[in-house]
Every structure is written in C-alpha cells, then in structure tokens.
Amino acid sequence: MSVDKQLRVMIMAGGTGGHVFPALAVADQLSSDNAEISWLGTRAGIEADLIPKQNIALNFIDIEGVRGRGLLALLKAPLLLWRSITQALAILSDFRPQVVLGMGGFASGPGAVAAWLKQIPVVIHEQNSVAGTTNKLTAIVAKRVMQGFPNTLPKGEWCGNPVRTEISDLAPPDLRFAGRSGKLRLLIVGGSRGALAINTLLPKALAEIDPALRPEILHQTGRAHWQQTIDLYDNETLGLADSELSVVPFIDAMEKAYEWADFVVCRAGALTVAELTSAGLGALLIPFPFAIDDHQTANGQMLVDHGAAEMIQQSALTAANLAAIIVSIMADPDRRLTMAMSARALAKNQAAQDVAKVCKEVACGQ
C-alpha cells in the first residue's frame, strides 16, 4: 500500500460487547488515522444495534455457533459455513480492504477464510486468556496474532485488550477516591446482557446488611432482566432513596459509572477485566459458570493474583456470603484503594493503538 493511499480495514467482530467494544476502540484509533472502516457481523449480535450508531458501514453474514447444539446442527454446519464464506467473499470484493481484523464472534471465522481465499492479509486479536475455537483456527492463516492475555496462542503478541479512551483517560484511583465520604458506591455489572444469578442475589444480599450501612447501588441488569430485577429490589423494601439506587438495563457511558464507583461486583469477561484495570477499580469477580473452557475464571485469576480482585464461583455464592463480602469491603477503604491501584498497575492502555499499528504494518506488507 502506498503511503498516500487511504487504508481500508474490514473489522470482523460480533455477538457480545466483549468482542464489539474492543473492536470499536480499535476502529476509533484507525478512524483517527483517516482509515476507512467497514464491519462484518451478524444480525443476531449486539453489533446490529451498536455499529450503525457509530457511522460505520455494517455488513451481515448468516452464521451461528454449533458447539453444544446437537447432532443436527453439526450435520448442517458445513453447508452453513460455506454459505457464510460465500457471503463474506462478496462483501470483501465490494469493499476491497487492504487488511481484515478479526476480533472474535461468529463472523470472524468465515470472514478470515474469505480473506485468505482472496489473499487479503488477516490480523486477529484474542481477548480471552483461553482462546476460542474461531481464533484457534484463524490464527493458522493470520499474518499477525494479537492477544489480551499472555501465553494464549502460540504465535501471539501480548498487547492487552483495547479499551475506549473515555475509560483509560480517567484519573487514577488515588485522585478519584480522595475526599470521598459516606456510603460505599457499588457498581453491579453482569456483562452487556446482564447476569440473572447476580441480579437475583444482589437485592437479597443487601437485605442482610444493616439498613444504615447499605451501599449506594448502580446496577446494570441487561435488557432481558431489567423489570424482573426492579421487582426483586422492590420486594426487599431496602429503604434506599431514589438517589441511592439506580437499576438500568444498560449503561452506555461506562466511563461515568467507573468514575462514580468505589467497588464493582461483576462477571470476569475479558472486556470487564480490561476495563477494571484501565479505570483502576477493585472487584468481586463471579465468573460465568458456562463460559466455554471456563475462560472467565482464567481471565479473572490475573487480577486475583495481583491483589486487585476477589473471586467466588457462582456455585458457592449465597446472599449471606455476598453480603459478608460487601460489608468487609465497606469497612476497609484502605483495602479498596490498594485493590484499585493494583488493578490500575495492570492496565495496558496502548492496546488499541498497538492493534491499529499492526493493521497498518500488515497492510503495507511488513
């Protein structure tokens, strides 16, 4: 690619926020360098709603996962895969990118195969500490392999997980926490789709805490569980003022939520872990028990090992022990700050720039 020719990048990412938001962080970086971006995803993923709002061209292919879906799905898989590759070939022929970037999700596999067939170089980024099936396969044809955690893929380069600059630009926790007083500010996040188990237990746990000590709550429930969670809070009659309890289906401005919070109760998805380090916040991690290859436990272990988080498996979680953990965190502001500073020390805030740089290098034949 000549230096005066505009870079065109096809980004392939979808399904959940854990794939889409890191990819958007890279897209922002590439766009700031005047690259033209097009997106490959599916109609069923979160990208179908989010990407058009970013003024990025969005293309769909028809593909879904088959793992755990039974024999019939496996038998249909080759035909469906070939159809999705054919669709991706047509989209690539129309856009003519110099490089494609796979950030995970069902669209990445067919898109990477189509790019390889058209001799368009492929870059992939694996967010989790345990690689997904798609990235294990696409790594074979990729020119460069980037990864959010060390030692995930054989030829992977550890750059961290891309995080939006609005989060990485937050003041460090020692400055944010300075002068704070009053109740603990507790942020509850179960991922972009919410977490039913956390939604169900939190109101019950709060009911076991002395009413005078109950923390202020900002709780992202996921759109499907919003009303149900509100009803659970109402049933517990917690006595929290409207200003002390906010239950929302989705938080668009996560940077504001992180800036407000003293501590987080959350899953251990790769994006959540990266954002905790970037913002600098201690957390109680509750890994999703049905994550493929239990990758959320592996993701969260890095924070635990560095004193930035506690972790408890969902199978061991009760309202009583969740309440006890919250009370212990409330009682020890020095510990909260130490955990937050330990998280911040793990941040790799140049990840988006690093992935964008690799895309440009690969497009130029380096």
Where are these regions (language model features)?
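Donor-nucleotide binding loops and adjacent catalytic segments primarily
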Residues: 45, 50, 54, 172-264, ...
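C-terminal alpha-helical cap of glycosyltransferases
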Residues: 348-366
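An amphipathic, basic-hydrophobic alpha-helix
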Residues: 70-99
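A short, well-ordered alpha-helix in the C-terminal region of glycosyltransferases
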Residues: 335-349
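Active-site-proximal region of nucleotide-activated glycan assembly enzymes
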Residues: 36, 46, 57, 116-174
